[in-house]
Amino acid sequence: MALEGVLKEGFVTTTADQLINWTRNGSLWPMTFGLACCAVEMMHAGASRYDLDRFGVVFRPSPRQSDLMIVAGTLCNKMAPALRKVYDQMPEPRWVISMGSCANGGGYYHNSYSVVRGCDRIVPVDIYVPGCPPTAEALIYGIIQLQSKIARTSTIARKA
C-alpha cells in the first residue's frame, strides 16, 4: 500500500542493470570449497543461528549450479588445479570470496613449500574475509559486501 501511494501512475521505472543486479543480489548460490578449519565457520554461518538463507544464500552441491565460490582454508599446491577446474565449471557471472588468512595469503603456513600464498594466484577474488579462522559474522559481512558490489556493477554492455 505504501508503494501505491508513492506511485500515482501505478508503474515503476528502472534500468535493466538495476533489475538484473537486484535479482542476482538476492539469490547468491555459493559452492563451498572448504579446505581447513575455516570451513567449520562457514558451516556455522549456514546453520540456524546465523541463517544465511535470509540473505538469499543457498548452498549448492555442484559448481554448475553456483555463482559464488567460498574458498575457506589452506590451499596446497596439489589442490590448486582442482580449484581452478571447479572455478572454470561455474557459469558466468561468478564471484569468489577468499575466507581466512590461509586462503588470503598463506596464513600460518605462508613459508611452507606446499602452500599457495593466496588463492588469488589461482582464481580472481572479489572479497577477502580476514581472520584465523574468521567468525561467522565476518563471513556474513563479506557476503553483504559482495551483494553491494554486485549492485554497483554494470551487466549490460553499452556502446559508446
UniProtKB/Swiss-Prot annotation:
Compartments it resides in: Cell membrane
Molecular function per GO: 4 iron, 4 sulfur cluster binding; iron ion binding; NADH dehydrogenase (ubiquinone) activity; NADH:ubiquinone reductase (non-electrogenic) activity; quinone binding
Pfam families, alphabetized: Oxidored_q6
Disulfide bonds: none
Keyword set, alphabetical order: 4Fe-4S, Cell membrane, Iron, Iron-sulfur, Membrane, Metal-binding, NAD, Quinone, Translocase, Transport, Ubiquinone
Cofactors named for this entry: [4Fe-4S] cluster
E.C. no: 7.1.1.-
NCBIfam families attached to this UniProt entry: nuoB_fam, PRK06411.1
Family: Belongs to the complex I 20 kDa subunit family.
Complex formation: NDH-1 is composed of 14 different subunits. Subunits NuoB, C, D, E, F, and G constitute the peripheral sector of the complex.
Protein name in the entry: NADH-quinone oxidoreductase subunit B
Protein species of origin: Polynucleobacter asymbioticus (strain DSM 18221 / CIP 109841 / QLW-P1DMWA-1) (Polynucleobacter necessarius subsp. asymbioticus)
Lineage of producing organism: Bacteria, Pseudomonadati, Pseudomonadota, Betaproteobacteria, Burkholderiales
